[in-house]
Regions:
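Short, small-residue-biased leader/transition segments that mark boundaries at the very start
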Residues: 1-9
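C-terminal helical "lid" of AAA+/P-loop NTPase domains
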Residues: 10-21
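Peripheral, non-AAA+ core regions of ATP-driven protein-machinery
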Residues: 26-61, 68-220
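Conserved P-loop NTPase
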Residues: 3, 13, 74-77
Length: 220
């Protein structure tokens, strides 16, 4: 079942329960759900992130899957004067923290010329929406790209996003929830998405109208 369909079913359930309570309490004899009353019943619409307007070094757009469907997320990285400590915030689970450590090790090996930056500064990795728990390995490629952007000082284009687990040797491994993630990317204004090569078969489950609006590049 797609994330969009799941969301519709959840909202229908809320409407039915709302109507049942009103009828049982005798507050109303019948209930008509009009377009104007939807906000009264369901509240305001869900807020979805949009791509960055002004990209900066160290910040890259990733893709996540949640129980509510796909979402984009931003990986933010920065250096501050220090002695090499690593600070990770944003309510990340153990698996995602391990992905961050793998990304750090990989970037150090890819850019030995910037080794002093890691020694002479503290590294802060943050994933916004700190009240929302985040976990899983699929942000690996995004973490590597964000750290690469930080050490080189080159911002990643705002219209790109990515998803994929990364190994210590730099390989990109498959992830789950690709249809939902691509739907979220297209909704947010992303134009170009990098996905694991091993997930190419999953594109058969992605709606044509989503694929038509995205340039999708497989990586290994």
């Amino acid at each position: 079942r797609s994330s969009a369909a799941s969301d519709v079913y959840k909202r229908q359930d809320v409407l039915c329960r709302y109507a049942a309570v009103k009828l049982v309490k005798g507050e109303q004899k019948s209930i008509t759900v009009s377009e104007k009353r939807v906000a009264e019943f369901l509240g305001h619409g869900i807020h979805h992130e949009k791509i960055l307007e002004n990209p900066v070094p160290g910040v890259v757009t990733g893709l996540a899957w949640t129980s509510a469907g796909g979402e984009i997320l931003f990986i933010e990285t920065s250096f501050t004067k220090g002695d090499g400590k690593v600070i990770i915030t944003g309510q990340l689970g153990d698996v995602m923290k391990e992905s961050a450590q793998i990304a750090i090790t990989l970037v150090k090996s890819l850019y030995p010329e910037f080794a002093d930056k890691f020694k002479e500064n503290d590294l802060h990795i943050h994933v916004p929406a700190g009240a929302v728990p985040k976990d899983g390995p699929s942000a690996g490629i995004t973490l590597v790209t964000a750290l690469s952007s930080l050490v080189t000082g080159k911002p990643a284009p705002a219209e790109i996003a990515m998803t994929g687990e990364v190994s210590l040797r730099g390989g990109v491994m498959p992830i789950g929830g690709l249809p939902e993630k691509l739907m979220a990317a297209q909704r947010a204004g992303v134009k170009h998405v990098f996905i694991p090569y091993e997930n190419m078969d999953d594109l058969d489950d992605v709606a044509d109208e989503v694929k038509e609006k995205l340039e999708i590049t497989p990586v290994t």
